[in-house]
Amino acid sequence: MNSDLTSFDKIEQKIDGSRKISNYIIGGMLTIGGIGFLLASISSYTGRDLLPLGNPSALLFIPQGIIMGAYGVIANLLNFYLWYMVYINFGSGSNSFDKSSKSVEIKRKGLFKDIEVRLDFDEIKSVKLDISEGFNPRRRIALVIKGRKKPLPISGAGELKPLLQVEEEGARLAKFLNVNLEGLK
């Protein structure tokens, strides 16, 4: 959760999506690498150097040129997918908690359409902190909803905030919703 606008009866949280610096860096690397592999493959087929570095026209088209072409196609498909996710800002949205209407509204950008979840305060059982450390650490806040097995995550994907900040946000939200806070040991 990037920014919080808090008043006495309302909390608004903005969630960042896929427009992160790491996605721009990976997208740029995939673009350069994918085009480079395709140009090397075409150079080995035509016998003309299309790249300023190296001598790809000296490569045999079978098997090196074909393999480099396949790598280039795969890289460009991944590249297209990643840039599309960045373009639509996949996963961005907002959380809105309103005490006056006793409702929660969660909005996210999906792949093909937007996702909206509306809940009443009565449906929320507790606020859960899902914290795991190790090789793939995870620190997220989720709502435990009555009648649902899995908690509904409300923090952004891929966010790794300091533990104290996650605990404070979870405690503030649990106090605002007047429910228990789970997950602290």
From Swiss-Prot:
Pfam families hit by this protein = Ycf4
Q: NCBIfam families of this UniProt entry?
A: PRK02542.1
GO biological process terms held by the UniProt record: photosynthesis
Its recorded name reads Photosystem I assembly protein Ycf4
Report the function annotation for this chain. Seems to be required for the assembly of the photosystem I complex.
- Do the record's keywords include Lipid metabolism? no
Task: Give the similarity note.
Answer: Belongs to the Ycf4 family.
**How does the entry describe its membrane topology?**
Multi-pass membrane protein
Family annotation (InterPro entries): PSI_Ycf4_assembly
The entry's localization annotation reads: Cellular thylakoid membrane
Give the keywords, sorted: Membrane, Photosynthesis, Thylakoid, Transmembrane, Transmembrane helix
Cellular component terms (Gene Ontology) = photosystem I; plasma membrane-derived thylakoid membrane
Question: For this UniProt entry, which segments traverse the membrane?
Answer: 24-44, 58-78
